[in-house]
Amino acid sequence: MVLSLRFNHGSRVFRSIRDKFEEMISDISFLKTEGGNTQTSERKSIEVIKSVLDGLGLKYSEAGSQQSKDFRSVYKNVKSLGINIEIKKTNGLTVYFNDTLPTEDIYYIIFVMGKEYKVKDNILPQVIFINGSDLIGPDKTLLREYQEDINYLKDKWGRKKCFGKANEFTNFS
């Protein structure tokens, strides 16, 4: 019951963010990466969403550079019902999540910048607002198993605090 209430409230907040975005922004072409400078365009997209959140009077904290969940605990009145938002950008139809998997407690705003092709249909610029659980769909169980395996290997080989093999390296940290 509590998780359902939290999810429903989060979905309403996210819909209001989507609606405000559509009211404020009609063209996303200014977010296109120029000359391979992805960090500049990423900062622009975060600033756009920040202006939407501020326009709605929402409170939030921002993640540091290269951390997941660009906006954490986004809320209006009740902080414990806050949502997490991750901003993604892509030119085509593939979204890269690097080392984090989508989950139902993260809402995604995906800027699809579009792509023109000579032979097949072009991909039009668009913005997708979606919950992480909708992204993973029926693959949820497999992804959970995958994440457990990855965490096991990270603990064994890469996390010194877990007292695994990483502590045995002499020339690597």
Language-model features, listed with the residues they occupy:
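Nucleic-acid endonuclease domains
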Residues: M1-S80, K89-S173
